[in-house]
C-alpha cells in the first residue's frame, strides 16, 4: 500500500509525520484526528507498524473521531464492502481506547464540526471548518474531485450512489447559500473552489 497509495510506511508513523514536523510539531502534539470514513486510503495514516512490528496509533495522544455507524459497518458487510477496510487501520485505535464516536452532526471543537454525507459509505461524514464568518467544507469522498460537482457525476466506488446524489444536493444548496469553500481531497489539479451563485446548476468557480 505504501508503493501504490502512499498511505503507509514501515517503522515510522507514516508520511504524515514529515509534514507535521515540517510545520514545527510532532505526532504527540496532535490532539484530534478526524476520519471522514475508514477506507484504507483515508484511515491508512491512523496507525503505523513500529520497529518491533507492532501496529500502533500514529497519534497516541489524540482522540480519533468517526461516526459510530462507520466503525460498526467497517467490521461487517459482504466482500465488496470488506475490500476497502483494513482492520489494522482502526482496531488498534479501539484497543488503545482512543476512539471518540459521534452519531450524526457533531461539534468536534471550536470552529470544526462534522456533518453526515452518506452514499460513498452509509456513514460517511464531511468536515466543516468555520472561521471569521466563513466556512470551508472538506468533502472527502462525497465529492472527491472537481469533476464530481455536477449532481449526476458519482463515483463507481460509492456503495449507495443515489444516496450520494441526495447528500450532494443538500450540501450544494447550503454551500451556494453560504458561499462555502469546497475542498477536494482526491483532485490532483483543483484543490478548492466555490459554487457559482448565478448558475441554475452546480457550477464550480475555481480559486
Regions found by a protein language model. Name each.
Residues 38, 69-70, 119-121, 140-142, ...:
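Active-site metal-binding loops of divalent metal-dependent hydrolases
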Residues 11-25, 29-41, 56-116, 166-179:
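Metallo-beta-lactamase
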Residues 1, 73-75, 146-150:
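Short acidic/His/Gly/Ser-rich catalytic and metal-binding motifs that mark active-site loops
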Residues 43-47, 113-125:
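Active-site glycine- and acidic-residue-rich loops that bind
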Residues 43-54, 194-196:
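Metal-dependent catalytic neighborhoods of phosphoester/phosphodiester hydrolases
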Residues 7-18, 128-207:
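Cap/insert and terminal regions of metallo-dependent hydrolase folds
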Residues 20-24, 51-57, 126-133, 137:
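Short amphipathic alpha-helices and their capping/turn segments at secondary-structure boundaries
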